Amino acid sequence: MSDYSLSLVREEQEKCIGCKACMKGCPMLHKYCHNPKDLLTELLNEGAFDYKLPYSCMLCGYCAEVCPTGVDLKALFLQLRKDVVNESKGKLPKELNSKAVDFHQSFSFSRIFTSDIQNLQSRTIFFPGCALMANSPEIVENTYNYLREVIPGTGIYAKCCGKPTLFMGKEGKFREYFGILEKEFREKGVERIITGCQNCFMTIGQNSKGLEVVSLWEVLATKGIPKEKAGIGKDLDFDFTLHDPCPTRSVNIIHESVRSILEQLGLSYGEMKFNRNRTLCCGSGGMVGLTEPKIAKDHTSRRASEASADYIITYCQECTESMRRGGKKSYHILDLLFRDDFQNMKQENK
């Protein structure tokens, strides 16, 4: 463990009062301890750790949100991941399945599989994110066409934000990848970025100075949804449960915008017990689906089971897929806005 990491452990250990509030929403703590105070004390005394420990954390930030004294295990475990990368000289243990992330990221920044900013006739671009592009290219195209109507001249940038690399602890490689984005933003004179992904919203917002980063949901809420979709959900005779993605748990404008969109659609929906700033991860956070698949699978099942309605509606592609793996019928809000999935749902419920 690096000296810096040890100092972080000491800070968190001193702050922790052992109330276990964080354990209500964290599966990895249940695997490694009965009380986070004990775990932090052990790390402090040993000055070392099992490399799987930090890669079992979903890095969702729930702990810091609910902790009465401000303990932030996400920041600590991300730093410990960086220690593992440094100590292994970038060659992470095979059990972490990091090669899958490396391949994904190399393709996501390859000129063969991605493009530079296209169709830019203003200072605004749409940054849909790699998950949405890979899973729903039709929806990305339709969403972009909508944006071109309400914000003429909007360009589009088909790249990844690099967060998978950052969350694996490879900060140097992340800076290299993110530098590609910054160079393109600078050369094309981009000033405003509309993101379709919660991870992209946070990553670009936290790492780009002087750029305005806006969520697609805020744009949709203020500009209005496509006219032909207004009130269309009123014809459905079943309900939805809304799942808030964890990356933007602290961004209230996104929470409000999404709920405004659902109301414009005319959808009947309910809230999960853990919602908004206290939402739970879907199980895909922190690349744990690769590094500790059992923890991810168990937590996904738990989160999906917390929805009482026929369908789960969310606004993150990874969350959508996770809820389906958890055994629920799940839709991305863009499925309803820019693809005719209302008809599919009606057929399913006949």
Regions found by a protein language model. Give the residues of each.
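Iron-sulfur-cluster electron-transfer modules
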Residues: R10-Q13, H30-G196, F201-L211
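Cysteine-cluster motifs in flexible loop/terminal segments that predominantly coordinate metals
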Residues: C16-C22, C60-C63, G283-V288
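Cofactor-cradling patches in redox/metallo enzymes
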Residues: A131-E218, R249-G266, G270-K350
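Hydrophobic scaffolds flanking metal-cofactor catalytic centers in soluble metalloenzymes
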Residues: K15-A21, P27-T41, K52-Y55, T248-S260, ...
